[in-house]
Amino acid sequence: MRILFCSNYFTHHQIPLSDALYELTNHNYCFVAHKEMDAERKNLGWGNDLVRPYTCSMADQEVQKQLNNLDVLIAGSFPERQTKEYGKKAKLFFRYSERILKTGNSLLKYPKRFFHWHACNPPWRKAYMLCASAYTAGDYAKFGLFRGRCYKWGYFPETIRYPSIDDLIDRKAKATILWCGRFLDWKHPDDVIEVAKRLRDAGCCFKIEMIGTGEMEQQLKRQASDAGLLETNI
């Protein structure tokens, strides 16, 4: 099976699904980006570590290779003229979109888009929607589009299996509690010592950090030391 995914540019959002399709199709998968990623996103780190063997530009020969006997086309933000050209060669056609009613549910703001979307997705074209948002299907349904023809985006979270949950808990860092204030009687910093005693007696793994200065500082250190908390928990 040959799959061609076309969009404006390749981002980390598409990596897990693209990696899976690349392997499932025995490397007959290609992602086509039609423009360079803008500087703002690059500065945010979007372009880092995005080199993949299946990514290419519209001018690459790999695209023409994929178009020969193309089975599936997935089209996101891509020039419509090219999308139609590629779509004619595909046996199965998917649109790829986030939600379209991001500023509310008023349809009166979108009359031009209504006609544009219907022109790009006529009822006689058997097209499907690959939803990049939980709201995509509902938004397009309000315009009478892709009803009953929407599919969820593919997620591939890593599953880590540990031989022992108890060992994992033992390796976890201690929970940290921060108390910050002046060490004064009416601030009741000594209550922190009492809390620490209760947590220790309950078998909790924790560390308390106290930040501040004041007349009770030495008293608090003595209380923590007498309770056996100074070196271990506070």
Q: What is the predicted function of each stretch?
A:
Residues 86-105, 130:
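Active-site proximal beta-strand in glycosyltransferases
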Residues 218-234:
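Nucleotide-activated donor-binding/catalytic signature segment of Leloir-type glycosyltransferases, i.e.
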Residues 1-48, 64, 68-70:
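N-terminal subdomain of nucleotide-sugar transferases
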Residues 33-37, 180-184, 207-220:
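Glycosyltransferase donor-sugar binding loop
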Residues 166-198, 209:
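Conserved donor-binding/catalytic core segment of Leloir-type glycosyltransferases
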Residues 2-5, 60-81, 94-95:
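Short N-terminal targeting/anchoring amphipathic segment
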Residues 124-172, 176:
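Donor nucleotide-sugar binding/catalytic pocket of nucleotide-sugar-dependent glycosyltransferases
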Residues 101-121, 159-161:
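Nucleotide-sugar donor phosphate/pyrophosphate-binding loop at the beta->alpha transition
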